């Protein structure tokens, strides 16, 4: 085909965690939208959301949202350096 080959995008939770951890080191409070600023694909958005849920569950962040379809705000409550790999890939 003249359009070339379409590659399947693989985004693992571990890879996304590395990105989010780095972001958390620089920002103590931010919106979910800010995590997606790098032109995220649908798969990347889903994986980012799953990592955020895992970080909530482990107590490293708190999340608040005023209402349905409102912005999601994230506050870092733990030390990002202490976050270990997510093995749920």
Question: Which residue ranges define each predicted feature?
Answer:
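A charged, low-hydrophobicity C-terminal interaction/regulatory region common to genome-maintenance complexes
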Residues: 1-89
């Amino acid at each position: 085909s003249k359009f070339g080959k379409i590659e399947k995008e693989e985004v693992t939770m571990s890879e996304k965690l590395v990105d989010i951890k780095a972001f958390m080191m620089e920002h103590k409070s931010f919106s979910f939208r800010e995590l997606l600023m790098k032109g995220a694909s649908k798969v990347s958005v889903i994986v980012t959301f799953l990592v955020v849920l895992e970080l909530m569950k482990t107590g490293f962040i708190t999340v608040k949202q005023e209402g349905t379809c409102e912005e999601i705000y994230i506050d870092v409550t733990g030390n990002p350096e202490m976050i270990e790999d997510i093995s749920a890939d």
